């Protein structure tokens, strides 16, 4: 990236098929009470007042549709074969303009994330932390299980957290993490940063930042929007 640093950019990987949702369309394009999930996710980022630009990675055959839905609100790029490739392509798209100081990566499926959570995250970044993720304490007991279905142990719940998005990073750290991503499978961007030795801090998450993955999640999302 060239031309100095400025502001906060957000990347929204929205190229997944959404097979578990079984909605008949890619998950990000599901209509939740009149607005697609990706539309709600992007607008929530802007409503925070701390995000300057958004890049959305969508299925290659949905780029025109995404441009119609989002208009000039976001830059649209064709996503890749997996989440890591989609985010990488979105990062490349950011290089066309002024390099942001920070980059947030936010799941389109967490479409109801409150703008206040985005503000808390960016405040932590501006306070000097290079990587910040929102988390919630676990309420269920967690078991480690082997391939044969045998319980190996019970991790101490007090030290475990469920991780949400958006996840925020200094641009330099996130770019370095993606340069060293290789072929390893990472389920989130914080894992990539941990892989290159980055220290990740946490900020309090929000129950409304839940990930819409299955039909039960959809029922909850509709209920939340309807109030």
Curated annotation (Swiss-Prot):
Pathway linked to the protein: Isoprenoid biosynthesis; isopentenyl diphosphate biosynthesis via DXP pathway; isopentenyl diphosphate from 1-deoxy-D-xylulose 5-phosphate: step 2/6
GO BP annotation list: isopentenyl diphosphate biosynthetic process, methylerythritol 4-phosphate pathway
Residues flagged as site, Transition state stabilizer: 20, 27
Enzyme class (EC, first level): transferase
Family note: Belongs to the IspD/TarI cytidylyltransferase family. IspD subfamily.
General function of this protein: Catalyzes the formation of 4-diphosphocytidyl-2-C-methyl-D-erythritol from CTP and 2-C-methyl-D-erythritol 4-phosphate (MEP).
Protein name according to UniProt: 2-C-methyl-D-erythritol 4-phosphate cytidylyltransferase
Species of provenance: Mycobacterium ulcerans (strain Agy99)
